[in-house]
């Protein structure tokens, strides 16, 4: 949730559009009706609800999803479910680092979602610490 917000703010400022972010739990600053979806976090190994207030998302909105990391795409699936429930239109997703070896980006692209990543990691070696980026092959 928090690491992607700064990046989303920069992108929104560049495009001159507002930022809406999903929370991973109900909090005091989200009042009223919400859209929600259950998401299993690969990184944290647990299931949580992502929540967006209905007052910030509706059928007239066009959404560019911005996130810092993508692994298997489960978080993106949850966001897509929330956006679909709202009636808004997803125009694409911008990812800072995609873990290509976990397949989320390719799966979402094959479903027709435009996904653009600044860097795609194809291999990570736990023993040597070596990271292989897609363009390095």
Question: Predicted segment positions?
Answer:
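Short, glycine/charge-rich flexible loops or terminal/linker lids adjacent to PRPP-binding catalytic cores
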Residues: 16-63, 129-136
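Short, well-ordered alpha-helical microsegments
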Residues: 4-8, 101-103
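Short glycine-rich phosphate-binding loop at a beta-alpha junction
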Residues: 1
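Acidic, divalent-metal-coordinating active-site segment for phosphoryl/phosphodiester hydrolysis
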Residues: 69-76
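Short, flexible, glycine/charge-rich loop motifs used to bind or transfer phosphoryl groups or to couple energy/partner
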Residues: 10, 52-55, 105
């Amino acid at each position: 949730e928090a690491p992607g917000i700064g990046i989303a703010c920069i992108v929104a400022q560049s495009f001159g559009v507002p930022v809406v972010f999903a929370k991973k739990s109900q909090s005091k600053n989200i009042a009223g009706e919400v859209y929600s979806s259950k998401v299993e976090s690969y990184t944290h190994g647990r299931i949580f609800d992502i929540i967006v207030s209905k007052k910030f998302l509706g059928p007239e909105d066009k959404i560019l999803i911005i996130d810092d990391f993508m692994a298997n795409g489960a978080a993106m699936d949850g966001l897509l479910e929330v956006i679909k429930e709202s009636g808004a239109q997803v125009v694409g997703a911008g990812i800072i680092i995609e873990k290509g070896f976990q397949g989320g980006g390719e799966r979402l692209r094959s479903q027709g979602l435009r996904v653009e990543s600044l860097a795609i990691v194809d291999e990570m070696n736990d023993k040597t610490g070596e990271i292989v980026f897609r363009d390095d092959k």
